[in-house]
């Protein structure tokens, strides 16, 4: 691709200033520059990428310590990365996955661990079916308008799980499902928001799956290259170490000021940072009350991403692929994936320390976390080789002042219906991007691209360069990564829930008892 570079300095007039040099902000800037709009990106850190970050050193070659995964139906990030010359590779699932629960290891294949207890199976099946059916009622672009929005928004996911699930095993796995997908606790998040989140990621199976799901692939060379290559195209239109502290749109032109006292003038602003981080910026005039309230009410999830490197992929000797789903309160890690390079070099296991565990384990030394993780892997995989890594990398996203956490912001109960509708609403000449504002794969790189390009098209419309009907556009399917439709089986659709089974049994028992009484009465009458 040809360079989009254009000289820019403080004091120069720009058409658009983008706040935030993550994938969302940079995809917005790229689209604007392609339409010959004079754009400047102001990034607070010494690097671009935001919540994606590829670390490079002699021990790991490269490693994604932030957002990394892409898969079918994530067509915008796949199209953008292809334009930038990046390739993907599939995360290894050739061997068996592992489910560790109640101190035992159970190998399996597929998206979810199998359940052998028939009552528990009915409970699990009803859980996924109910969540997906509830999600179908929720508009992806306006969850606050769902028919049961107010009712579901008053509930936490803990409330909903307890309402749906009869068995302890299903309740525990459902809680883990929340931890893994949104790095927060079931009692912290709105049921409406979580059901919407799963729905806009394609449903319970798509969001949780590796094959044909959200974790199917990674980028050769790391996901950080997406932002780095856009930065190369934009050249000095991207300013690093420039945290924005002040936005004044009270005059004809907007004034943007950074922490190091640089001033920039522009016609429009795109904010492409997590909603809560806009509280670090002073606005003139003040933000509308709903927007001001919203940004104070969207906490970030908590996660420490951990990569353990080994001399060889010893887990493959046992026909394990490296993916572990771990149900154990004392275990630091809740889920792992193979993080070996696509050519088989640098064998590694990636694991997430999630939610409450991230808070707890952030308080101990890195060496203690490393030891606890190795001991866990040795126990789950049944191999002492897990105790002898050759290198360890980790990233605690809760320490990042310009992210505040990962993967995404979440909505506590009551916030979506009260304030959610303003999340994408412009404030004067300020427009909002960031993965939290997306309607498909929000929380992922795909959502970041959708939001950035949508905000850019909103500005292009304001500049008279684009029709309003072209702001929201459908993305064609990526030919290189086709999606296979996920269709529930006949039994998955029609098996009763545990409560349904009890009703059937109760009804059958009543009919049998009635028949028996009538039969006996007939015999007595004849005698």
UniProtKB/Swiss-Prot annotation:
Q: Residue numbers for the site described as Important for substrate specificity?
A: 335
Positions where S-8alpha-FAD cysteine occurs in the chain: 406
**How does the record classify its membrane topology?**
Single-pass type IV membrane protein
What is a GO molecular function of this protein?
monoamine oxidase activity
Which cofactor is essential here?
A: FAD
For the region Interaction with membrane phospholipid headgroups, give the residue spans. Answer: 520-522
Q: What does this protein do?
A: Catalyzes the oxidative deamination of primary and some secondary amine such as neurotransmitters, with concomitant reduction of oxygen to hydrogen peroxide and has important functions in the metabolism of neuroactive and vasoactive amines in the central nervous system and peripheral tissues. Preferentially oxidizes serotonin. Also catalyzes the oxidative deamination of kynuramine to 3-(2-aminophenyl)-3-oxopropanal that can spontaneously condense to 4-hydroxyquinoline.
Gene3D superfamilies named in the record: 3.90.660.10, 6.10.250.130, FAD/NAD(P)-binding domain
* Sequence positions bearing N-acetylmethionine: 1
Enzyme Commission number(s) from the entry: 1.4.3.21, 1.4.3.4
> Under which name does UniProt file this protein?
Amine oxidase [flavin-containing] A
Q: Which of UniProt's keywords are assigned here?
A: Acetylation, Catecholamine metabolism, FAD, Flavoprotein, Membrane, Mitochondrion, Mitochondrion outer membrane, Neurotransmitter degradation, Oxidoreductase, Phosphoprotein, Transmembrane, Transmembrane helix
Q: Which organism is it from?
A: Bos taurus
Gene that codes for this?
MAOA
Which residues does the annotation list for site: Important for catalytic activity? 374
Record topology, Mitochondrial intermembrane segments: 519-527
Of the GO CC terms on this record, one is: mitochondrion
């Amino acid at each position: 691709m040809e360079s989009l570079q254009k000289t820019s300095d403080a004091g120069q007039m720009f058409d658009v200033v983008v706040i935030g040099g993550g994938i969302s902000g940079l995809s917005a800037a790229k689209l604007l520059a392609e339409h010959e709009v004079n754009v400047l990106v102001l990034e607070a850190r010494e690097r671009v990428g935001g919540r994606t970050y590829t670390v490079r050193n002699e021990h790991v070659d490269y490693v994604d310590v932030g957002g990394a995964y892409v898969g079918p139906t994530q067509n915008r990030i796949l199209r953008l990365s292809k334009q930038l010359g990046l390739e993907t590779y599939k995360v290894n699932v050739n061997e068996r996955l592992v489910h560790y629960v109640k101190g035992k290891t159970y190998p399996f294949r597929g998206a979810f661990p199998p359940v052998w207890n028939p009552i528990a199976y009915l409970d699990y099946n009803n859980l996924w079916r109910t969540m997906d059916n509830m999600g179908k009622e929720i508009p992806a672009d306006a969850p606050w308008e769902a028919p049961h929005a107010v009712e579901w928004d008053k509930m936490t996911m803990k409330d909903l799980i307890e309402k749906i699930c009869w068995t302890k095993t299903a309740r525990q796995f459902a809680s883990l499902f929340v931890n893994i997908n949104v790095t927060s606790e079931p009692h912290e998040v709105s049921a409406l928001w979580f059901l919407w989140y799963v729905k806009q990621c394609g449903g319970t199976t798509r969001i949780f799956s590796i094959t044909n799901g959200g974790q199917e692939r990674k980028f050769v060379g790391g996901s950080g290259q997406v932002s780095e290559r856009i930065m190369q195209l934009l050249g000095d239109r991207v300013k690093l170490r420039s945290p924005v502290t002040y936005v004044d749109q009270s005059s004809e032109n907007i004034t943007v000021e950074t922490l190091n006292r640089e001033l920039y003038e522009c016609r429009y602003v795109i904010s492409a940072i997590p909603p809560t981080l806009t509280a670090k910026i002073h606005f003139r005039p003040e933000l509308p009350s709903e927007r001001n309230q919203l940004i104070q009410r969207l906490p970030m999830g908590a996660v420490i991403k951990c990569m353990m490197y080994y001399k060889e992929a010893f887990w493959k000797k046992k026909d394990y692929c490296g993916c572990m789903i771990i149900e154990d309160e004392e275990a630091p890690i809740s889920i792992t994936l193979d993080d070996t390079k696509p050519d088989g070099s640098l064998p590694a296991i990636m694991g997430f320390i999630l939610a409450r565990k991230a808070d707890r384990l952030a308080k101990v030394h890195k060496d203690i976390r490393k030891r606890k993780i190795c001991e866990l892997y040795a126990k789950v995989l049944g191999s002492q080789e897990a105790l002898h890594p050759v290198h360890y990398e980790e990233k605690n996203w809760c320490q990042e002042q310009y992210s505040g956490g990962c993967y995404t912001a979440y909505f506590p109960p009551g916030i979506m219906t009260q304030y959610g509708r303003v999340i994408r609403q412009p404030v004067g000449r300020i427009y909002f991007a960031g993965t939290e504002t997306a309607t498909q794969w929000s929380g992922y790189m795909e959502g970041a691209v959708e939001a950035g390009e949508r905000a850019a098209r909103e500005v292009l419309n304001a500049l008279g360069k684009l029709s309003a009907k072209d702001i929201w556009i459908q993305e064609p399917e990526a030919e290189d990564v086709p999606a296979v439709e996920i269709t529930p089986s006949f039994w998955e659709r029609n098996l009763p829930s545990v409560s349904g089974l009890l009703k059937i049994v109760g009804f059958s028992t009543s009919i049998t008892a009635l028949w028996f009484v009538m039969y006996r009465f007939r015999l007595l009458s004849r005698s």
